[in-house]
Amino acid sequence: MGQNTVKGTDATFSELVGSPLPTLVDFWAEWCGPCKMMDGPLEEIAGDLAGKLQIVKLNVDENPATAMQYGVMSIPTMMIFQAGQEQKRLVGARSKAQLESEVASFVS
């Protein structure tokens, strides 16, 4: 994980998304090219919005229970949570500008 993002696991997921901060969870896998393209933009956004937004990266191969629980069928899938509840789901790679637009209403 980068210095601004948090590694999520099946064991820590509920605690992480229950954070008082809005939380964007990136469901990804090591073998997924589009997932790797998201690393830079997600790390930059996590740094830019530190203290306003938490970004969690969850490897679906290492943590299949959470991916199954939330019905993640393709990756990358990103979900925005507030107080433990899913608020928005984004399937597929996005640019930094697109991601910033998607999270803007949660961090204002």
Put a short name on every predicted segment.
Residues 1-54, 61-108:
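Proteins that catalyze or organize thiol-disulfide redox chemistry
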